[in-house]
Amino acid sequence: MLKKTSLIFTALLMTGCVQNANVTTPQAQKMQVEKVDKALQKGEADRYLCQDDRVVRVVHATHKKYKKNLHYVTVTFQGVSEKLTLMISERGKNYANIRWMWQERDDFSTLKTNLGEILATQCVSQTSERLSGQ
């Protein structure tokens, strides 16, 4: 009886070590970016020229219920648009969401990631255009 048990135990150990485990590597998740329909935007679009010839486009959106206070902007940088919400700031205006932070100042503006990585710095407003939407 002891001989059979040890033989079965050894066989199970051998088969446990021999089996191939299919390990799948996790695929990197892509961030889903909210699509912004630029044709329907109302407000004022500013084009900022930044250091290293980077361009940032900022749309200060106006809606009927937000006419007095601008609560958000849409920032476009390198083909990606993000809707940023106004935050409290001592100097200038800060807009942010979970990914980006736009610091709007009188002299220079800056676009950063929320991890602190600078995407565009020393941005100066070049042109401004009115957007009427549809």
From Swiss-Prot:
Name of protein: Opacity-associated protein OapB
Source species: Haemophilus influenzae (strain ATCC 51907 / DSM 11121 / KW20 / Rd)
Signal peptide: none
Lineage, top ranks: Bacteria, Pseudomonadati, Pseudomonadota, Gammaproteobacteria, Pasteurellales
Gene this chain is encoded by: oapB
Transmembrane spans: none
InterPro entries listed in its UniProt record: MliC_sf, OapB
